[in-house]
Design a protein with these regions (language model features):
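Glycine-rich phosphate/pyrophosphate-handling loop used in enzymes and phosphotransfer proteins
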Residues: 1-236
């Protein structure tokens, strides 16, 4: 109920007071055209460490303390749907459109958070990318939640344990998908890479189910040491 009332108030406020760009402060959008263009054109995919050899390629596109990370935090915890559309456009133009035909698989959000926020933020981002691509990129929900664990604030050890129980493959959807597109490139997407435990375990499940081409894309990660920049397999 708390989140529902908050969403209504937020929608009314947005109607009365248009949002300001999170990059430059310009009135009228959560991210203005100029800032979207700047972020997209300067986006660099950097290699994710700790992917455990599960993926053909594992990259992140920005840091949590940058504009993309701020947009994600607001979208998730304040239920600002408009920001998800801006994130999707930047990620599509800055990286995903360079992959060619691909299948996006969103990491499923816990059912508790979906109820609270009245949305699954990663599924919404992937659906918008599918729309922007004109059908070149497809979104398929190969994964579902198995257990409603919440990892925010958990230690790395707890996260690893939770990750093994958090998601499962949708066997019916996967079987149909593999019959129709056995050689498709699957792109597993999540908003934040912290320890990477959830994405790695999800990747293992997809590989075990028969997915042969698997890429991991985290939109942001916590800032640690600098990682080498790559774009579609090339050292930048």
């Amino acid at each position: 109920m708390r989140f529902g009332i908050k969403n209504v108030v937020k929608n009314i406020a947005d109607g009365l007071f248009p949002p300001r760009c999170r990059g430059c402060g310009e009135l009228g959008a959560y991210l203005c055209k100029c800032c979207k263009k700047n972020i997209s054109e300067n986006m660099k995919a950097r290699e994710l460490e700790g992917a455990g050899g599960v993926f053909d390629e594992a990259v992140y596109l920005g840091y949590r303390d940058e504009i993309l990370g701020e947009l994600i935090e607001e979208a998730k915890y304040e239920s600002v749907r408009g920001e998800l559309l801006e994130i999707a456009e930047v990620v599509w133009r800055g990286y995903l459109q360079g992959l060619g035909e691909a299948v996006l698989v969103p990491m499923p959000t816990s059912r508790k958070h979906v109820r609270e926020r009245a949305m699954d933020h990663m599924d919404r981002i992937c659906r918008e990318v599918e729309r922007l691509s004109g059908g070149k990129v497809k979104r398929v929900r190969l994964l579902t939640r198995a257990k409603d664990t919440v990892q925010v604030g958990a230690s790395p050890e707890v996260r690893k344990k939770q990750a093994k129980e958090a998601v499962k493959v949708d066997e019916k959807v996967v079987a149909e998908f593999l019959r129709e597109r056995p050689e498709a490139r699957v792109v597993l997407m999540d908003d934040v890479w912290t320890t990477g435990a959830s994405m790695v375990e999800a990747g293992k499940l997809l590989c075990k189910a028969g997915v042969s081409k698997l890429t991991a894309v985290a939109i942001t990660k916590s800032r640690t040491r600098k990682s080498p920049a790559i774009r579609h397999g090339e050292i930048d």
